[in-house]
Swiss-Prot record:
CDD domains in the cross-refs: EFh
Annotated organism of origin: Mus musculus (Mouse)
Protein known as: Peptidyl-prolyl cis-trans isomerase FKBP10
GO BP of this protein: aorta morphogenesis; collagen fibril organization; extracellular matrix assembly; in utero embryonic development; wound healing
InterPro entries noted in UniProt: EF-hand-dom_pair, EF_Hand_1_Ca_BS, EF_hand_dom, FKBP-like_isomerase, PPIase_dom_sf, PPIase_FKBP_dom
Gene Ontology molecular function: calcium ion binding; FK506 binding; peptidyl-prolyl cis-trans isomerase activity
Subcellular location per the Swiss-Prot or TrEMBL entry: Endoplasmic reticulum lumen
Binding annotation for Ca(2+) 2: D554, N556, D558, K560, E565
Residue ranges of domain EF-hand in the record: 496-531, 541-576
Leader sequence residues: 1-33
PANTHER family for the chain: PEPTIDYL-PROLYL CIS-TRANS ISOMERASE FKBP10 (PTHR46046:SF3), PEPTIDYLPROLYL ISOMERASE (PTHR46046)
Amino acid sequence: MFLVGSSSHTLHRLRILPLLLLLQTLERGLGRASPAGAPLEDVVIERYHIPRACPREVQMGDFVRYHYNGTFEDGKKFDSSYDRSTLVAIVVGVGRLITGMDRGLMGMCVNERRRLIVPPHLGYGSIGVAGLIPPDATLYFDVVLLDVWNKADTVQSTILLRPPYCPRMVQNSDFVRYHYNGTLLDGTAFDNSYSRGGTYDTYIGSGWLIKGMDQGLLGMCPGEKRKIIIPPFLAYGEKGYGTVIPPQASLVFYVLLLDVHNPKDTVQLETLELPQGCVRRAVAGDFMRYHYNGSLMDGTLFDSSYSRNHTYNTYVGQGYIIPGMDQGLQGACIGERRRITVPPHLAYGENGTGDKIPGSAVLIFDVHVIDFHNPSDPVEIKTLSRPPENCNETSKIGDFIRYHYNCSLLDGTRLFSSHDYEAPQEITLGANKVIEGLDRGLQGMCVGERRQLIVPPHLAHGENGARGVPGSAVLLFEVELVSREDGLPTGYLFVWYQDPSTSLFEDMDLNKDGEVPPEEFSSFIKAQVNEGKGRLMPGQDPDKTISDMFQNQDRNQDGKITAEELKLKSDEDQERVHEEL
């Protein structure tokens, strides 16, 4: 189309005309009707395609971009922007277009299509354009509007979806990761991050983005979706960008914010559940067992200890895990649930790791602390109840004891109980028959006393665990001492309360035949016990103990004991010392 008095192919006019679009009820559209056969007084407008949504209509002073075909009444084409593959980009209502086009574009929506009939006095008048448009020509235009903006425009941000929980909003100097679809105002797609299989990662307010995007992302929450409309002077302006973004184009971005952090961020802690009576908190050097769910800021799960049905076990504050977790686990209580938000510079940095944690990703861990201990921990003993009467004798190494117990993990998981059996547990203290921590915890008890024992794994089943007991697990025992008997010295199966008879063999040889078979030996020992003169090793089968005693005295294993063979253990020990000397 043409400037008045110019040969350039654009529609122009030198003076500003008021908006004169008037409704008409003609079948062809809008405009001022003329009597039949009379010349048109105004532009006739036919809106033959109106988009469902029209958030904005063209007003005087707006900048528009549109395509058109121009023909005469007989259908002969005199001009077309399509033929030049170039949109018309111009300001409406300031005299740069012929008056008829200025009026015909007013009130138009993006993607609307109109047919305009422009009478000569609103087109090129009685002069026309030499060689192209004859004098007094009525002009027919088919127009589609692709873009509209104004110099007074700002970035328009519309929240499409905002999560109910917003831990933080984007601010200048933050680093963000987001997905986007980018289109022109008419819906033509020019770019999207999804096709590249990765987010767009950048700093905000540092000049790395077009100005409108810098502004449009401010205030967003992780997981939020926004529609951001950017006028060209806050985008790529008069030059456009490559072949995909034309000059003076408004841009529309549909953005999903996945992540936001600031290089100055520290680890953020949120206590979700704190058990009552927290008497100890984890410190650097402790060994901890915990469950966790690890997710990205948008909620995408990247790892979980629950899926492996096994806690994560590690030292805290020793560099075995990412720095953010090392920091975030310190100060936790056993049984506590806490949320640990770790910025990327305290996690896996800009490179990420594997195929589930992208570069520059903020990580969120929902942690349940099962237990922790320190390699220097002793058995922790707490008396729950003690008999009211005086307790003159307490359990010690070598004692034979009977006791009841319940054993669980610190999270309450039940492991074992003596109450599942018909009788209490029986052991000789110090005989290495139970875990070391339990053995220690049972020492110094009164009969009838109840205790709580917390046993660290290095005094229990260690890092490998045992059947039903996880590796590196701290164990909780509730024990009750039922009975206690003095034990025998190491290596002894039987002891006398007083010095034995000087005629011991003769006393054993019941039939006086000079030898003692198993039956006589057993009868003699049992009689000593029944008469209160001596006692067998407690906690053992008496017959088995007596049989072992007989085997020890039957030196030549001929099934009988002679006077030469019979020796007290104290005499044997003395002979051994003499031989060694």
